[in-house]
From Swiss-Prot:
Keyword Repeat: yes
Family indicated by similarity: Belongs to the PRAME family.
GO-annotated biological processes: negative regulation of apoptotic process; negative regulation of cell differentiation; negative regulation of DNA-templated transcription; positive regulation of cell population proliferation; proteasome-mediated ubiquitin-dependent protein catabolic process
Each LRR repeat, start to end: 17-40, 99-126, 181-205, 206-232, 233-268, 269-294, 295-326, 327-348, 351-378, 379-403
Keywords: Leucine-rich repeat, Repeat
Keyword Nuclease included in the entry's annotation: no
Name of the gene encoding the protein in the UniProt record: PRAMEF27
GO cellular component, one term: cytoplasm
UniProt name for this protein: PRAME family member 27
UniProt xrefs under InterPro entries: LRR_dom_sf, PRAME, PRAME_domain
Record lineage: Eukaryota, Metazoa, Chordata, Craniata, Vertebrata
Signal peptide interval: none
C-alpha cells in the first residue's frame, strides 16, 4: 500500500502520545525522542496534567527557549508546578542531561507562534520549515552571567494580591536566586498596596526593566516611595505615569522637594525614548525641573489632561531633548488664555521628524491659530493630525486646511465641526453642518485628494458622545 506524505508525522504523533500513557516508557526513551516531537507532546502533557512526563521533558528540552506563557493561560497550576519541579531538579543537582539546551524560561505575555509553528509542522511533516520559522529571542544583557537559567516575566500588579501562578513563581525564584536570573522587561502597576509592590521590586533586577506603566492614582507621598526604584531602572526606554495627584496635606515646600527627588532620577535614565504623562497634577509650574533632567532625545512625548502654566510651555519649547520627536500629544491641556508662540517654536524644532500631532481639547480659539500655522505647514513628515475640541470658526478652519493641504504624507486628519455648525444653545444644526462639510470637502478636493479626513462633533444627539464623520458623510464612530 502506498503511504501518503502525511503518514510519517501522523505515526510519529501517535507514537509520541503513547509515551504519555506509559510514564515508565517515557522515562527510558526521552533521550532518543525526535526533537520535533517535543513541542506537540509537551502541549499534550501540559493540557492533560501529565506531571511526571512534564518534569522529564523539561530536563531533556532540546531547545534554547521554553515559551510557557501561552500554555499557563489554561487553568493548570499543577502542570506549571511540575515544570518548575523539573527545572529545580536540574538546578540543584548541577548536572544536565546530554540533550538539555534550555537557557530561557519565557513567561512574557507576547504574541507567540512557537507552539503554533510546531503544531502545524506536526500536521504537515514540515519540520525543517518549523526550525527556520522560529521567532528570534531577545536576550537579557545579564544572561552572560553565572546563572545557567534566565526566567523572563512581565509583571502586571493590578490587584491587592498576585495571581496564583505569579505568587508560586516568585516564591520559587526567591528560594533559588543564586541559581537563576529573573528578568522583567515590562512592569505595569495598576493597583496594589505599595508594601506589596516594594517586596516584588526587591526581587527583580531593576536594570532589566525597559517599560514601566504606573496608573493607580498615587499621591506624592506614595510616589516618593517608588522614586528610588525608578533611578535604578537604567535601561528604561518607556515610562507611563497616569493619575498622579498632589495631596492636600502636602505644603508647597514639600511638593517642590518631592518633585525634585522624583525628577532627578531622570538623570540616570540614559535609554529613555518614550515619556507619557496623563493627569499628572504636580507638573504645574515644575515641568522645567523634569525637562532639565532628561539626558536623551525623546521620540515620544505625551503630556495629556494636565494643568500647565505658560512658563511650562516656554520651557518645553526650549528643551534640547525634544528636537527629534516623532509623536507629540498635548491633548487636554487648556491653552485658551496662553500665547501659542512657545508651541510655534516647539513645532519648528520638531518639523523634520514629527509624524503624529494631537492637539485635541486644548481650547484653542481663532485668534491663536495663526501663530502655529507657518510651523505646522513645515511638518512634512506628519502623517496624523488631530485637532478636535477646539472652538474655531469656518474661516479659521479653512485657513488651517489650506496650510495642511501641502503636507503630502498626511494620511489621517481630524478637525472640529466649526462653530457655525451649532445653534445658540450648543446643539448641532444638522442641515447647516452638512452644508459646511460639503463646502469644505469641495475645497479640499480642489487642492489635494485627502486620504482620510474626519470632522468631529460634540454631544451627538443619539449617544451624547463625540462622533466623527468622513468624506461621504457616513458616521465613522459614535
Amino acid at each position: 500500500m502506498k503511504m501518503s506524505i502525511r503518514t510519517p508525522p501522523r505515526l510519529l504523533e501517535l507514537a509520541g502520545r503513547s509515551l504519555l500513557r506509559d510514564q515508565a516508557l517515557a522515562m527510558s526513551t526521552l533521550e532518543e525522542l525526535p526533537t520535533e516531537l517535543f513541542p506537540p507532546l509537551f502541549m499534550e502533557a501540559f493540557s492533560r496534567r501529565c506531571c511526571e512526563a512534564l518534569k522529564l521533558m523539561v530536563q531533556a528540552w532540546p531547545f534554547r527557549r521554553l515559551p510557557l506563557r501561552p500554555l499557563i493561560k489554561m487553568p493548570c497550576l499543577e502542570a506549571f508546578q511540575a515544570v518548575l519541579d523539573g527545572l529545580d531538579a536540574l538546578l540543584t543537582q548541577g548536572v544536565c542531561p546530554r540533550r538539555w539546551k534550555l537557557q530561557v524560561l519565557d513567561l512574557q505575555d507576547v504574541c507567540e507562534n512557537f507552539w503554533m509553528v510546531w503544531s502545524e509542522a506536526m500536521a504537515r511533516g514540515s519540520f525543517l520549515n518549523a526550525k527556520r520559522n522560529k521567532t528570534p529571542v531577545q536576550d537579557c544583557p545579564r544572561m552572560r552571567g553565572q546563572q545557567p537559567l534566565t526566567v523572563f516575566v512581565e509583571l502586571w500588579l493590578k490587584n491587592r494580591t498576585l495571581d496564583e501562578y505569579l505568587t508560586y513563581l516568585l516564591l520559587w525564584v526567591k528560594q533559588r536566586k543564586d541559581l537563576l536570573h529573573l528578568c522583567c522587561k515590562k512592569l505595569k502597576i495598576l493597583g496594589m498596596p505599595f508594601r506589596n509592590i516594594r517586596s516584588i521590586l526587591k526581587m527583580v533586577n531593576l536594570d532589566c526593566i525597559q517599560e514601566v506603566e504606573v496608573n493607580c492614582k498615587w499621591v506624592l507621598p506614595i510616589l516618593t516611595q517608588f522614586t528610588p526604584y525608578l533611578g535604578h531602572m537604567r535601561n528604561l526606554q518607556k515610562l507611563v505615569l497616569s493619575h498622579m495627584d498632589v495631596s492636600r496635606y502636602v505644603s508647597p515646600e514639600q511638593k517642590k522637594e518631592i518633585v525634585t527627588q522624583f525628577t532627578t532620577q531622570f538623570l540616570k535614565l540614559h535609554c529613555l525614548q518614550k515619556l507619557y504623562m496623563n493627569s499628572v497634577s504636580f507638573l504645574e509650574g515644575h515641568l522645567d525641573q523634569l525637562l532639565s533632567c532628561l539626558k536623551t532625545s525623546l521620540k515620544v512625548l505625551t503630556i495629556t489632561n494636565c494643568v500647565l502654566l505658560e512658563s511650562d510651555l516656554k520651557h518645553l519649547s526650549q528643551c534640547p531633548s525634544i528636537s527629534q520627536l516623532k509623536t507629540l500629544d498635548l491633548s487636554g491641556i487648556r491653552l485658551t488664555n496662553y500665547s501659542l508662540v512657545p508651541l510655534q517654536i516647539l513645532l519648528e524644532k520638531v518639523a523634520a521628524t514629527l509624524e503624529y500631532l494631537d492637539l485635541d481639547d486644548c481650547g484653542i480659539i481663532d485668534s491663536q491659530v495663526n501663530a502655529i500655522l507657518p510651523a505646522l505647514s513645515r511638518c512634512f513628515e506628519l502623517n496624523a493630525f488631530s485637532f478636535c475640541g477646539n472652538p474655531i470658526s469656518m474661516a479659521t478652519l479653512e485657513n488651517l486646511l489650506s496650510h495642511t493641504i501641502i503636507l503630502k504624507n498626511l494620511c489621517v486628519e481630524v478637525y472640529p465641526a466649526p462653530r457655525e455648525s451649532y445653534g445658540a444653545d450648543g446643539t448641532l444644526c444638522w442641515n447647516r453642518f452638512a452644508q459646511i462639510r460639503a463646502e469644505l470637502m469641495n475645497r479640499v478636493r480642489d487642492l489635494r485628494h485627502p486620504k482620510r479626513i474626519f470632522f468631529c462633533i460634540d454631544n451627538c444627539p443619539d449617544c451624547g458622545n463625540r462622533s466623527f464623520y468622513d468624506l461621504e458623510a457616513d458616521q465613522y464612530c459614535c
